[in-house]
Amino acid sequence: MAAVRPRRTALRPGPRAAVTAGAAALLAATSVWTFGSVSGAEAATTLTVAKDGSGQYTTVQAAVDAIPAGNTARVVVSIAPGTYRGLVKIPAGKQNVTLQGSGAGRSDTVLVYDNASGTRKPDGSGTYGTSGSATVAAEADGFQARNLTISNDFDEAAHQDMSALQAVALRTAADKVFLDSVIVTGDQDTLLLDTASKAAPGRVHMKNSSVVGNVDFIFGRATAVIDTSVITLKKRWDGSSAGYVTAPSTAAGRKGFLITGSTVTGDVSASSFHLGRPWHAGGDATLDPMATFRNSTLGAAVKSAPWTDMSGFSWKDDRFAEYKNTGPGSGAASSDRPQLTDAQAADQETADWLAGWTPSAS
């Protein structure tokens, strides 16, 4: 039987390569066929990014841009260790994209930028706004991020003349989002877990990860599970300790944030942080924000009355609860500290949030 032996390395868009075949495999006399690769990433399952030019692309956005519109097959963007300063957006038409650091640890590959809500756009069309400030914005279903850091390093101290200091590191506005072994770090509004619209689904599963911030730094209307992760409380720009972990904006009848098997900690003052407050985005009274912290370890920074009001909306009118938390920041059931019953807790498990979706690395 004749053999056809292609070149062992993957073709990049553009180059040509030779394939040698045994004579018995050919009907014509020639023994070398020449092939050209297609442009873009139609046939690719993995695209490589490296700052030094050793990959197919030198920026993450260039790799994302190479994925064809309408893509539904999984495409892994493998990113070599290094710090990549720039914005990354995965638009709605490019489903099932994975951003994956190829280093030994999640701190080795860093995607970072420094826009804030009040940062003016270069074209003079206004400011970015909170959602537009994101370093990485994922708007396509099936988005995954793994083994990397996503950061917004906006310098609040240097911009106290700016009125809108919210600075998002990662924004997701999609369904079936899987964040595995990532660090998402910033100050105010670090992690925006959202949906494409008020009526759209937006399931998120975050595990083995770390989220760092100080004010409303896990927020949005997604149905999100944060599991086996570390939530790190960070001091404000002036060195003070005060903040809020979550600000859910859940639609009525939907599930909001479930933090389970995780740790809330940080080098901040005792009794200085709330676990959450209700964000009725745009003053929408029809929303029913929801956050549950369960089976987690709460550090001493957590206030004894861990929930508080926001913009005239009382947390007691929405859905905030705990279940079997431990640590110096935990506390017994009281009017300030609603605890789920065992029966209620049985309906607030990860599987209830994911509703038939089983995230898997791919």
What are the functions of these language-model segments?
Residues 2-24:
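N-terminal export and membrane-targeting signals
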Residues 30-45:
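C-terminal region of N-terminal signal peptides and the immediate post-cleavage residues
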